[in-house]
A protein has these predicted regions:
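Iron-sulfur-associated redox domains of electron-transfer enzymes in respiratory
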Residues: 1-146
């Protein structure tokens, strides 16, 4: 079987699929993405991989196949809009766990556009290492719990 055929068939290369909001216009979206990266770094790629959220509504066969083959499907959203959960569900998958940072770690959403015209700030000035760690810990727990 060719690599392309394996992708399309959904050969399970990662035990668990993680789908994340990574909205770069707010602190919650950025924190969600960073926490997922940290969780995969801690767990290893065999245990969990951040999947291509855009591949679900566009019917990218490898993304659909790998999601079908995953033991768990975990969504991580920054805010109550829950875009990643909704996209995953609209693609026909039921998340095993749905993490929402504003709900689950009490994070307050801040739009990066609030500071436009008030001086230049780096994106990371909006991010709390403590909130990234709390979110990462929730993701790791969701992957590891039986």
């Amino acid at each position: 079987m060719s690599e392309q055929q394996q992708w399309e068939a959904g050969v399970n290369t990662h035990e668990n699929a993680v789908f994340s909001c990574f909205g770069g216009a707010s602190n919650t979206g950025i924190t969600s993405g960073l926490a997922c990266l940290e969780a995969v770094k801690e767990l290893g790629l065999e245990k969990a991989a951040i999947m291509c959220l855009g591949g679900l509504p566009t019917n990218v066969k490898p993304v659909l196949g790998k999601t079908r083959a995953a033991k768990k499907v975990i969504t991580v959203d920054g805010c109550p809009f829950e875009c990643s959960r909704k996209i995953v569900e609209q693609a026909g998958f039921k998340p095993t766990s749905s993490i929402v940072l504003t709900r689950d770690i009490g994070m307050k959403k801040k739009s990066l556009s609030e500071d436009i015209g008030k001086g230049i700030k780096g994106v990371m000035d909006y991010i709390s290492d403590d909130e990234v760690k709390k979110a990462k810990d929730l993701i790791v727990k969701a992957v590891l719990e039986e």
